[in-house]
């Protein structure tokens, strides 16, 4: 029962973590593009 709960939590957190990393990288890319660095 504990294994099922942990696997459910992990499967739920993985997409959220990937989405958060993607959004953060995208915002940093947009910010750098707006500042026109290099």
From Swiss-Prot:
GO biological process: cytochrome complex assembly; photosynthesis
Keyword hit for Transmembrane helix: yes
Keyword Cytoplasm: no
Annotated TM spans: 5-25
CC annotations in GO: chloroplast thylakoid membrane; cytochrome b6f complex
Annotated membrane topology: Single-pass membrane protein
Cell compartment(s), UniProt: Plastid, Chloroplast thylakoid membrane
An annotated Gene Ontology molecular function: electron transporter, transferring electrons within cytochrome b6/f complex of photosystem II activity
Pfam family name, one: PetG
Keywords: Chloroplast, Electron transport, Membrane, Photosynthesis, Plastid, Thylakoid, Transmembrane, Transmembrane helix, Transport
Function: Component of the cytochrome b6-f complex, which mediates electron transfer between photosystem II (PSII) and photosystem I (PSI), cyclic electron flow around PSI, and state transitions. PetG is required for either the stability or assembly of the cytochrome b6-f complex.
Subunit structure, interactors included: The 4 large subunits of the cytochrome b6-f complex are cytochrome b6, subunit IV (17 kDa polypeptide, PetD), cytochrome f and the Rieske protein, while the 4 small subunits are PetG, PetL, PetM and PetN. The complex functions as a dimer.
Similarity comment text for this entry: Belongs to the PetG family.
NCBIfam families recorded: PRK00665.1 (NF001907)
Name used for this protein in its record: Cytochrome b6-f complex subunit 5
Protein encoded by which gene: petG
